[in-house]
Design a protein with these regions (language model features):
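Short glycine-/polar-rich loops that comprise or flank the Walker A/P-loop
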Residues: 19, 46-47, 71-74, 115-117, ...
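Pre-Walker A (Motif I) flank of P-loop NTPase domains
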Residues: 16-24, 46-49, 99-100
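Motif I (Walker A/P-loop) of helicase-class P-loop NTPases
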Residues: 31-39, 63
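Conserved RecA-like ASCE P-loop NTPase motor core of nucleic-acid helicases/translocases
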Residues: 47-55, 76-80
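SF2 helicase catalytic motif II
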Residues: 97-101, 106-155
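Conserved motor-coupling elements within RecA-like helicase/translocase cores
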Residues: 61-70, 74-116
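Conserved interdomain linker/interface between the two RecA-like ATPase lobes of SF2 helicase motors
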Residues: 2-33, 153-220
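Flexible beta-alpha connector loops of hexameric P-loop NTPases
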Residues: 79-84, 126-136, 200-208
Length: 220
């Protein structure tokens, strides 16, 4: 695995142990494929998995990744765009255990997944995950509560960590799941400021005034 303690986290989830992690997705990694792989392992063992994301685009990404490794009947999506009737019908199917893997937007955090073993919330700093109606419930609060009460593993993931996720890490309630520093250096883009040396300024005196100096065009 590309993450420190990543393999032990996956093993714990698959074994049915309670593991909680703040996952900082490394540059270039396909987070949807990673979650799909773990959710499929959980479902294969007869348990349930729940993935909550901010918008339809992320739901589509997770659904596509899941359908590459599990049957379509194993995956249930719950989004506002489906309309009340279709959403309620899918809610009932989840309640009766007809779909072991549920993927959806904010309200999917309440999905009654049978034998829930693993839950994931991506990009928990996104405003779409906060209910605009009182009491303004955040999907993060729903899933952390469910993890505590139902004893399921939990991932809070994103490219950056929110203050709330950091507090959970510092309190010891969950641990961090990050790539080693050397790996991050290798994956991160090389950043070069235009006109950051006397040599560059001699070659292109107008670099300070130009929106795109000549060095940018040369790099492109």
């Amino acid at each position: 695995t590309a993450y420190t303690f990543g393999e032990s986290f996956v093993d714990a989830v698959v074994a049915g142990k309670i593991a909680r992690a703040a996952w900082q997705v490394a540059p270039g990694d396909d987070w949807a494929a990673a979650l799909a792989s773990l959710a499929a392992k959980v479902a294969l063992d007869g348990a349930g998995a729940l993935i909550v994301v901010p918008d339809q685009k992320d739901v589509d990404a997770c659904e596509a990744a899941l359908k590459e490794i599990v049957g379509a009947r194993q995956v249930t999506t719950l989004t506002a765009s489906q309309g009340p009737q279709a959403r309620y019908s899918r809610y009932l199917s989840v309640l009766h255990g007809q779909g072991r893997i549920v993927v959806g937007t904010r309200s999917a955090a309440f999905a009654p997944v049978e034998n829930l073993r693993f839950a994931a919330l991506m990009f928990d700093g996104d405003d779409n995950l906060v209910d605009p109606r009182a009491p303004y419930v955040h999907a993060r609060e729903v899933l952390t509560t469910r993890s505590a009460q139902e004893g399921c593993s939990l991932i809070l993931g994103g490219h950056a960590r929110t203050a709330e996720a950091q507090l959970l890490v510092e309190s010891g309630w969950m641990h961090e799941l990050v790539a080693p520093r050397q790996s991050l250096r290798t994956r991160s883009p090389y950043i070069h400021a235009a006109g950051d040396s006397d040599f560059e300024m001699e070659r292109d005196p107008r670099a300070k005034q130009a929106r795109l100096p000549s060095s940018a065009f040369q790099a492109a």
